[in-house]
Design a protein with these regions (language model features):
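Bacterial N-terminal signal peptides that target proteins for export
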Residues: 2-18
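A short, N-terminal "cap"/entry segment at the start of jelly-roll beta-barrel domains
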Residues: 24, 28-73, 156-160
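Extracellular/periplasmic catalytic domains that process cell-envelope and extracellular macromolecules
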Residues: 54-57, 68-70, 89-90, 97, ...
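Glycine- and acidic-residue-biased ligand/ion/polar-headgroup-sensing regions
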Residues: 80-83, 90-108
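Short acidic-glycine-tyrosine-enriched beta hairpin
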Residues: 109-126
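Ligand-binding loop in jelly-roll beta-barrel domains
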Residues: 125-149
Length: 160
């Protein structure tokens, strides 16, 4: 029977290889606990909930992933065509992709941006902004929040 004694550099390599393999298997089990998800905005199974009262009538939110009361939630946000979204801000930064419609967004101190389907926009945390969904609506946006989901009306925002 052949037996090799591992010492020095060979021992270090063997230990490091073992640790890397163990880490890979441990990481794989963590990632495997959560199933993958795909979702379309037209899915009739989506559960659309209400928006805060200062936002337009007919507005809706659908939670896609995560808990909106915790960090890292993803939502669809929907407003009817020809709706005005009054000035507001979010505690969290928001990453947005317009799914449908045409949305004109104005962040305080910045030029109005015209979002068309497929357009990505980034909104920094606490930066007030307003928007208008044009007649190509409804406007449906995918929004990824880093912090819990909220919308705080800016001073002077009218309640609808």
């Amino acid at each position: 029977m052949y037996c090799r004694i591992v010492t020095g550099r060979s021992l270090k390599i063997a230990l490091m290889s073992g640790l890397l393999l163990a880490g890979a298997f441990a990481g794989a089990s963590v990632f495997a606990q959560e199933p993958p998800l795909t979702q379309t905005a037209k899915d009739p199974k989506l559960k659309w909930g209400p928006c805060p009262p200062f936002l337009p009538k007919g507005c809706g939110l659908a939670v896609l992933h995560g808990d909106p009361a915790k960090n890292n939630a993803d939502v669809f946000f929907k407003v009817p065509a020809n709706s005005i979204i009054p000035s507001h801000w979010h505690t969290s930064a928001e990453r947005i992709v317009l799914i449908s419609g045409e949305l004109h967004v104005t962040y305080d101190g910045h030029k109005t941006a015209v979002l068309k389907p497929g357009t990505y926009a980034y909104g920094p945390a606490k930066l007030p902004h307003k928007a208008e969904c044009k007649n190509a609506g409804p406007c449906i946006l995918f929004i990824a929040f880093e912090s819990p989901v909220d919308a705080v009306p800016s001073e002077g925002a009218s309640k609808k």
